[in-house]
Amino acid sequence: RATIGRGPNPLLQNHPLMAIHPPLLYMGYVGLALPFAITLGSFINETKEDWVSKSRSVARVAWVFLTIGISLGAAWSYEVLGWGGYWAWDPVENVSFIPWLLCTGFLHSSIVQRKINSLVNWNYVLIGLMFSSTIYGTFITRSGVLISVHSFSNGPIGQYLLVGLLISLISLLFVGWKNEGYFKNSKKIDSLSGKFGLFTLNNILLSIAAFIIFIGTSYPIYFEVIN
């Protein structure tokens, strides 16, 4: 048993939620790797009949973990002075919210695909973005590239995460390109006023929110690179 050492950061000792919040977020992040693996595996093995149903089943579990983890994190940060209440514009808080927004959109748009075989290509893209956003979120948290009260490490792992992010995006694009004909059979939604149209509008709003948070969070990185 260790008898000497600095111990955990004082910010991590003040609340019992610290023992629950990070593992739940981790389970949510890991859970979003499963829809990505299921989808790519289904397309590569030519078993595309029920890829969206299988992906939706595991995405729901990941969404529950993310929702509880983010909620407990908000309650925890509210009790820590200087952390901006339940939520603040902090890089690590932002990047944990992005996959939640995308996953929420997918859980709605996947219903449209199952009912009327529409938004097929959109669901494929969403699954890839959900997983990629977890890698990007881990990069922001663990690399120290952005200053955050939630960042407690700074090491070389960031470069490996960027490689993983690049590989995941290339894999998504390549497999999608190889199966281009499959996506052409997707039906189009003519109006946003019906039930399925509202589901589409829901996805548009959630995706815009995720994009705005991504750009706002990542802008300091791009600004630093350009200058």
Residue ranges of model-derived segments:
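Polytopic transmembrane helical bundles with strong interfacial aromatic enrichment
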Residues: 1-227
